[in-house]
UniProtKB/Swiss-Prot annotation:
Residues 46-55 have a biased composition (Basic residues). Residues 1-34 form the signal peptide. It catalyses: Hydrolyzes the link between N-acetylmuramoyl residues and L-amino acid residues in certain cell-wall glycopeptides. NCBIfam families: PRK10319.1. Belongs to the N-acetylmuramoyl-L-alanine amidase 3 family. Its EC number is 3.5.1.28. It comes from the Bacteria. It comes from Salmonella typhimurium (strain LT2 / SGSC1412 / ATCC 700720). This is N-acetylmuramoyl-L-alanine amidase AmiA. GO terms for cellular component: outer membrane-bounded periplasmic space. Residues 59-273 form the MurNAc-LAA domain. PANTHER family: N-ACETYLMURAMOYL-L-ALANINE AMIDASE, N-ACETYLMURAMOYL-L-ALANINE AMIDASE AMIA.
């Protein structure tokens, strides 16, 4: 029986906390490395394989929406789910060219529940998780890119609150309701390490924004925060990138061009690479102390 299956059977939060601490200490939160063809998760949790020391860094890219969930739709009919999948595939290609193992939560037009997207990242032992979207808003004049990290203290702005509530309703499109089933351990471990994880997520967001700024308008110059379900990973730095507002006619046009999708993908990938360089420098500096 896997650690996660065992912990799910415990009824006391205190028992889960104690066992989770032991698992965290003994395993160092080891994650799985699996083939990309088996990315989709089911309700059954397969036993994870231990990630080998010295293995490539792994970035899990999550193209938002998919299948029955189209995401936002532009005035001319562009669907968010298709645009962000194309961008995510471009980011994957760029990262792989830089020696980084990049994978997608979905490679086609399929629906994946929000919590499953988080679990996919953990099962593959991801070092980073990035959900890629294209904003939809009631005001067609809203424009620019934004980056969001998780918040456990409320949204950092009215826009952040609006977008997180909208994205968190994605499962309802497929008749599913987000529940806490099978996620008690995840919540407990999140409570244990959330401070460092959110801090690193905010840093990752700042690196991405710096790379996007020269090539595209920013809707927000700092990493926003809100309670996005898809960012609720206990130990993996996670951000949600809203590449543009697909409900803005001009930005819908841009998102429909191969050139812009490649340009924004390059900026995102360079932001990830920049973050890894920063992280390595921080780690080296800490060791010297």
């Amino acid at each position: 029986m896997s650690t996660f299956k065992l912990l799910k059977t415990l009824t006391s939060r205190r028992q889960v906390l104690k066992t989770g601490l032991a698992a965290l200490t003994l395993s160092g939160m080891s994650h799985a490395v699996a083939k990309e063809e088996t990315l989709k998760t089911s309700n059954g949790h397969s036993k994870p394989k231990t990630k080998k020391t010295g293995s490539k860094r792994l970035v899990m890219l999550d193209p938002g929406h998919g299948g029955i969930d189209t995401g936002a739709i532009g005035r001319n009919g562009s669907q968010e789910k298709h645009v962000v999948l194309a961008i995510a595939k471009n980011v994957r290609a760029i990262l792989r060219n830089h020696g980084i193992d990049a994978r997608l939560t979905r490679t086609g037009d399929t629906f994946i529940p929000l919590y499953d997207r988080v679990e996919i990242a953990h099962k593959h032992g991801a070092d980073l998780f990035m959900s890629i979207h294209a904003d939809g808003f009631t005001n067609p004049k809203a424009a620019g890119a934004s980056v969001f990290a998780l918040s456990n203290r409320g949204a950092s702005s009215a826009m952040a609150k609006y977008l997180s509530e909208r994205e968190n309703r994605a499962d309802e499109v497929a008749g599913k309701k987000a529940t806490d089933r099978d996620h008690l351990l995840q919540q407990v471990l999140f409570d244990l390490v959330q401070t460092d994880t959110i801090k690193n997520s905010l840093t990752l967001g700042s690196h991405i924004l710096k790379k996007i700024k020269p090539i595209h308008k920013l809707h927000s110059r700092t990493t926003e925060q809100a309670a996005f379900v898809v960012l609720k990973s206990p130990s993996i730095p996670s951000v949600l990138v809203e590449t543009s507002f697909i409900t803005n006619p001009e930005e819908e046009r841009l998102l429909g061009t191969t050139a812009f999708r490649q340009k924004i993908a390059t900026a995102i990938a360079n932001g990830i690479i920049s973050y890894f360089h920063w992280f390595d420098n921080q780690k080296a500096h800490t060791k010297k102390r």
